[in-house]
Amino acid sequence: MPQILPTDNPILDAAKRELAERAQKTAPLRTANDAYNGPARIISINTSAHKGTRKSPVADGHDTVIEQFGLASDAHAGHWHRQVSFLAAESIQTAQARGLDVNEGDFGENFTTQGINLLSFPLGTQLKIGNDVLVEISQIGKVCHTRCAIYYLAGDCIFPHEGIFGVVLQGGEVHAGDDIKVVKLGDGTCSFTPAEALQEVEQARREGTL
């Protein structure tokens, strides 16, 4: 919180402190680039039976990823451009440092990653997970039109500006602890993503709401 210089008016000082504390609590949670250290890997695989809710880590630490569909046991899987989702553990740690009681899956991500800033890669970048699974980045960030259960349960949601989505080019088994490798750097486009979806996200970024 920024330093609040005292004045001769204690009521004004208290009001300034309250406003500063409120601004700190409501400012967008963002993770510094230097927070990503160590090998790039999946540390948790998370699924849910319904959309708009927290996801839970799979009990045995592995699941099946289906080509052009997503995680077999997840509600967000389907024939669309947001088949799987990623969020960095470093982002969750940033939220924890702000006082939020959150852990892997609480922001609705399928894959909690560590050691790699996926936000730094353009659309179309292809990621190899473990031995088999190949995912192409299809959307970076999202626009939330309404606050879902995740926001109210966690107290905030960082996924709109720190999460990414992908489409499954090749399925297979995925395990917590699997390495993540960048096998192809994208050119900023993804043929699977509707133009209006990207336009909505870009407009939100320009307006400063994302």
Predicted segments, located by residue:
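Short, well-ordered strand-loop elements centered on a beta-strand within folded domains, enriched
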Residues: I42-S44, V168, D178
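Conserved ATP-binding/catalytic segment of the ANL
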Residues: G166, E173-A176
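A short alpha->loop->secondary-structure connector
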Residues: H145
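Short, structured beta-strand/loop micro-motifs enriched in basic residues and often containing a Trp
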Residues: D106-I116, D156-L169
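Short beta-strand-turn/beta-hairpin segments enriched in glycine/proline and small hydrophobics
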Residues: C148-I158
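Short, charged, solvent-exposed linker or helix-capping segments at domain edges/interfaces
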Residues: C148-A149, D178, F192-P194
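Conserved "cap/hinge" positions at secondary-structure junctions
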Residues: N131, D178, V183-K184
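Electropositive, beta-rich accessory/interaction domains or terminal extensions
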Residues: P2-L134, Q139-G141, E173, G188-L210
